[in-house]
């Protein structure tokens, strides 16, 4: 906006702060007028040391949507949250010296589940069959994830909790390869997705 407003134009609200309560409320009002039932927000996990400013904005958004009871669900920014390449999100790789990316994934999901199940005024989190819903960005590029999903399911069951996952796998590539890094057959890949996700979506619809 500052460099070339004639080309990029100017937002209706002007150059704004997306953590401003009035800005959040205005966007929700517009969404309601357009018949939009909920917002998906970017979530970078629980590492506040790495993502402090983003976490502050996210938490403010969650509080405000709670006040006016507007439905929301997180889009887990998998490569950023797990400090992995977006092309190969290997859950067995180290996140910390003694913590794998898969371990951090479990920690993040359990933290969200606790927030969505147990905190006061958490009814505005979108749910499917009473399970808070989470979208996983670039699920198609995950590697070595199965054992961590199994461990997460066990941990959630022990807490009498559940999560409903949506997978970003839809791409211009062949449907025979929904999990781009997997060596399993297409049938096995789709079976794994069906066992761990309730829906699929496409974040980016483009290809080389």
Q: Where do the PLM segments sit?
A:
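Glycan-processing catalytic domains of CAZymes
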Residues: 1-208
